[in-house]
Amino acid sequence: MHLARFPRRFIAHLPTPLERLDRLSAELGGPEIWIKRDDCTGLSTGGNKTRKLEFLMAEAELQGAEIVMTQGATQSNHARQTAAFAAKLGMKCHILLEDRTGSNEANYNHNGNVLLDHLHGATTEKRPGGGDMNAEMEKLADEWRADGKKVYTIPGGGSNPTGALGYVNCAFELLAQANDGGLKIDHIVHATGSAGTQAGLITGLKAMNAQIPLLGIGVRAPKPKQEENVYNLACATAEKLGCPGVVAREDVVANTDYVGQGYGIPTESGMEAIKMFAELESILLDPVYSAKGAAGFIDLIRKGHFKKGERVVFLHTGGAAALFGYDGAFDFSSRWVG
């Protein structure tokens, strides 16, 4: 599969590490756990969206854009990485931040990813939750274009066929690492939200005939909607790659049992996952996305979903910067001993 024919801005630190998690594996007593460290992509604390932005921002440059506009939730990792990428390329960035939680916490609204958005020079504006954010963004972009501004819009999560190419590439990268290290991967698990990561991964895996089951742990939409979104995007991505029909509907699997009360609202199991990964492996998760993916992964291990001795890769999508917007979700009073 010749990805080099697509414009790309090489910014990410790739390949990201593929590591075995011995202490977490021993603690859970199930499969042999490995982690693909896409929290280490290098741009402004890293994260999965940088892979997508390599292709999206290259397209923006080719179109002569002066401003990139995107949207996401208040503590959006995607927004932060877009702001950082734009700064790196000397472009302006404007972000529409959707209030999906109703939180009035100062750190949630001004710290974490929001602080980094502004540090990278982005301008932001808030929008109420529940609207069609991509449509609102396009409406605003059209108004700016009418004033003569050259605006390139990026959908939430960078999730369109161009952005999904970043995770087609990740699938190729992961398979190459496994082949070089003699690692037979039995399953891949990751958090899934805006659909681009899962769509790109499954397209890349199927294009390479890898035959590795891929499971997305949902963080927002119900299962039927999540799987529909991923499948439709995977089909469009495969079409763009020149391998239409390579992804079947049954290849797209999401488990949405770990969303909790809603997107961006921490769960008890997610907080447990954050503490387990931090205390056992010194790896940081975030309450919005990676922690819910890890919580589902941990629960499925405990329920025997994966066989003992199987090798399962958890793809870490990053997001640790959001921890500083959720300090109120933690209670470490017992850790103070003096």
Swiss-Prot record:
Q: Which reaction does it catalyse?
A: L-cysteate + H2O = sulfite + pyruvate + NH4(+) + H(+)
> What upregulates it?
Induced during growth on sulfolactate or cysteate.
The enzyme's E.C. designation = 4.4.1.25
Query: What GO MF terms are annotated?
Result: D-cysteine desulfhydrase activity; L-cysteate sulfo-lyase activity
Q: What does this protein do?
A: Catalyzes the desulfonation and deamination of L-cysteate, yielding pyruvate, sulphite and ammonium. Involved in sulfolactate degradation.
Name under which the protein is recorded = L-cysteate sulfo-lyase
- Superkingdom is Bacteria
The Swiss-Prot or TrEMBL record describes its family as follows: Belongs to the ACC deaminase/D-cysteine desulfhydrase family.
| NCBIfam families recorded | ACC_deam_rel, PRK03910.1-4
Query: What gene name does this entry carry?
Result: cuyA
For the modification N6-(pyridoxal phosphate)lysine, which residues carry it?
49
Cofactor(s) it depends on: pyridoxal 5'-phosphate
InterPro entries assigned? ACCD_DCysDesulf, D-Cys_desShydrase, TrpB-like_PALP, TrpB-like_PALP_sf
Q: What's in the keyword line of the UniProt record?
A: Lyase, Pyridoxal phosphate
